[in-house]
Every structure is written in C-alpha cells, then in structure tokens.
Amino acid sequence: GIGHLLRRRVQLLSGGERQRVAIARALLMTPDLILMDEPLAALDWNRKQEILPWLERLRDELSVPMLYVTHSADEMARLADQVICFENGRIVAEGPLEEVLLERWPGQGEQGSSVVLSGVVTERSEMWCTAVVTAGETAFEVPDAGRNVGEAARLRILARDVSVALSEPRDTSIRNVLPAVVIGMRGVEGESHVMLTLEAGGCRILSRITRRSADELGIAVGTRLYAQVKAAAII
C-alpha cells in the first residue's frame, strides 16, 4: 500500500513512489478501465522492480480491465494476458501472451526471442536459494523469488539460453535438462542461426542455435533431443 507515504512531501518521494501514488489516486475515482501509457519509461531498473510487483497485484486483485502501453518485452511478459503489437501504426500480432511470444513478437528480435510459461511453485530450498516451478508436466529449477509453494508464477526463458544435445548430458552444471522433440524450425538463408521450437513435457520453448550445429547434428522437425535450459527466471 501507500499508507506510509501519505505524510511525505511529494518532492521527497522516489520515482517509483510517485508512480504508486498517481495510480492510487486514479483508483480512488473507481474507473471502469485503467489506461497506463509507458508508466515506467522514466524509471531506472531498481525503481521498476519496486513498482512492478504492485502493478501485478492490481492486475490480480482488481476486477478492472487494464490497458498497458509499453515498448518493454520484460514489462509485457510480467503483466500481460492478451497482447496487441503495433508496427508503423499497423497491428502485426495479437493474441494470448504465450502465443505471441512463441510466434516471434516483432519487438524482441531474434536475440531477445523468448517464451513465457505459466506454472505453480511446487518446492522451495532454503539451502540452495532455489525454487521449483512446475509448468505443464515439466518442473524447472530456478532462483528463488520469494513466492510461496502453491503460488502461481510465470517463467521467462530466452531462446539464446537454451542449447540442445542428441544424447542425455552427463556431469553437467545445467540443472534443467528436458527430453524434447523439434516441432518447428525456421531460419533465413545467409544467416548464421536457426530457431527451433521444442515440445517438452507439455511446454513449448525456443532454442536459438547456429546453422552449422543444426546441420552437423542432423536436426530437423521430428528430431528427439535434450533441451538444456541454461537460465530460467520467475518474473
């Protein structure tokens, strides 16, 4: 809440605190729709992390529709359920968040291609400061973000953080090694990388590998392999 801010002068509030107060003032008007146009654009990373959890609570606890305008893939991944992407004034993609990201959201480019998976926290380890998030039939070990067991959680996995192997890796530091099958493969002649769409335990993830690796491993649609998720994070 903002109760502890009520007696503070506006000049003494941080950027994140000012945004929270502005949102609270808007909510006091009992709106039928909340429109936020780049609300975090002027904030640094730390201030964004201060206010994003608050926006998530608004999304989850209020019955008021929220229309959120942003150029940030991270903000979209954390807050959106349905996405409409514009480019030069035209709609170029729309639909559920997971589908739009999977089909290559125009704003993220190949380097930033990613998927968002919705799951539930099923384990937490105080010893290792990790948590297990189960999405579909797949369990992902990730850094603990403070969510309680049973809480819903979203995972974002970048394509560049997923490598593949034809045989099950042994003695590896990578904690998330998933049996998978290639269900899609795309690339452009003359480019050095290809994008694989993988099905792993009811989840679809992307893997960006070099064209040479794909050729030498004989990877094609239908190839069974192991996806090595080098990094996954609760968002």
For every predicted segment, state its role.
Residues 34-38:
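Catalytic Walker B motif of ABC-type/P-loop ATPase nucleotide-binding domains
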Residues 139-186, 204, 208-235:
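Glycine/charge-rich catalytic "coupling/switch" loops of P-loop NTPases
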Residues 23:
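Hydrophobic anchor residue at the start of the ABC signature
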Residues 9-13, 17:
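Conserved ABC ATPase signature
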Residues 1-5, 56-57:
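Conserved ABC ATPase "signature" region
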Residues 28-32:
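A short, proline-enriched helix->beta-strand linker immediately N-terminal to the Walker B motif
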Residues 56, 60, 70-136:
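Internal alpha/beta loop-helix hairpins
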